[in-house]
A protein has these predicted regions:
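Acyl-donor binding region in acyl/amide transferases
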Residues: 17-95, 213-275, 280
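Short alpha-helix boundary/capping motifs
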Residues: 184, 275, 293-295
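C-terminal structured domain segments across diverse proteins
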Residues: 187-200, 205, 209-212, 239-247, ...
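A conserved beta-strand-loop-helix scaffold within acyl/acetyltransferase catalytic domains
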Residues: 1-30, 66-232, 319-321
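Membrane-proximal basic amphipathic "stem/tether" segments
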Residues: 280-321
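Residue-level detector of flexible, active-site-proximal loop/helix-junction positions
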Residues: 145, 263, 283-286
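A general structural signal for short secondary-structure boundary/capping elements
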Residues: 57-60, 115, 145, 204, ...
């Protein structure tokens, strides 16, 4: 943490860990959530705060620093990279990926017309088909009571458990500890006024959901799912369409951050993207710099080997041909 007198002006939450005998400093996280961000108070200059953070990190001379989900174009992180270079630190950027942003503005027709013709036609067909079969509506839940939070989060869990994720063992209800984690996280968001739940309703019954946090006019999408038995109605597509229409009407100026890797379905709605990735740093010490150098050289080789394995035909298919 960085203080200016009695005022906290910046920080970077990290935890000590160890992997393959290598000492690491990294953001707190688990398999369901990345946490920890490079923070600088909006009322102060970025460079001195970040320089102080880098100076403090340099005291951990035996550790490699590993940051996931870094949004590289933001001023704190671009400054962080410059400060690492200034102290002759070594670093590497890995797993660079794109994340989609959707900014509808206050003119739904203009936004919808900006999408590809094929996508617009697909959305219209899906909505027409769904409305022919039943009553279609969208439920936006904000300012929930504690009891309602539990009720509706559990409804979301049940919907997801009726998808392919249940058989894969990756749904929330199929993962030990995951329901309580998301319920606790939702409670933190609720008490901070940030919790939003969206449900696609068919004849007043929810068939798809999106679990979001809203802060500073950015709606962050953390979990989305739908009941597999309604797959023929394209519930994910309809949820997104009705959600964006609602945001345009009720909350103009809100930006939807789709989080996660930009897949083809997200890209069809996106108006812009940003890059995230892993930043690995060795500031001081011979051993961390040697470890980082070895890691940066080995990672592409391992990745190429995995790609070859994943694209190689099996012996059975080779014999059949």
């Amino acid at each position: 943490m960085v203080w200016n007198g009695a005022q906290l002006v910046g920080g970077l939450p990290l935890i000590h860990s160890q992997k393959y005998g290598v000492k690491l400093l990294q953001q707190p996280r688990n398999d369901w959530c990345n946490a920890g961000e490079l923070m600088v108070h909006s009322a102060v200059e970025v460079q001195p705060v970040v320089a102080a953070i880098v100076q403090g990190l340099a005291t951990f001379s035996e550790s490699v620093l590993c940051f996931d989900g870094v949004r590289f174009e933001t001023e704190p992180w671009t400054t962080f990279i410059k400060e690492v270079e200034a102290v002759s630190g070594q670093m590497g950027i890995l797993r660079r990926e794109k994340v989609g942003l959707i900014e509808v503005g206050d003119d739904w027709d203009a936004y919808f017309q900006s999408l590809s013709g094929n996508h617009r036609s697909s959305v219209r067909r899906a909505e027409k088909k769904a409305r022919k079969s039943a009553e279609l509506s969208l439920l936006r839940l904000q300012d929930l009571s504690n009891d309602d939070r539990v009720t509706w989060m559990n409804r979301a869990f049940e919907i997801e458990n009726r998808s392919w994720k249940r058989d894969a063992g990756t749904s929330i209800l199929a993962s030990e500890g995951m329901p309580s984690f998301f319920l606790d996280e939702a409670e933190i968001a609720r008490t901070s006024g940030m919790l939003e739940l969206w449900f696609l309703m068919l004849d007043q019954e929810p068939i798809a959901f999106e679990y979001c946090h809203l802060a500073k006019q950015v709606l962050l999408s953390y979990k989305i799912g739908f009941d597999e038995s309604f797959k023929h109605l394209a519930p994910g597509k309809l949820l997104r369409k009705l959600q964006l229409e609602t945001l345009c009407r009720q909350s103009p100026g809100t930006v939807l951050d789709t989080k996660g890797i930009l897949c083809s379905e997200k890209a069809k709605w996106a108006t812009s993207t940003y890059d995230i990735g892993r930043l690995v740093v060795a500031l001081k010490g011979r051993i961390p710099k040697l470890v980082l150098s070895a890691y940066l050289h080995a990672k592409p080789i391992v990745q190429r080997f995995r790609n070859v394995e994943s694209h190689s035909p099996s012996l059975g298919s080779a014999g059949a041909n």
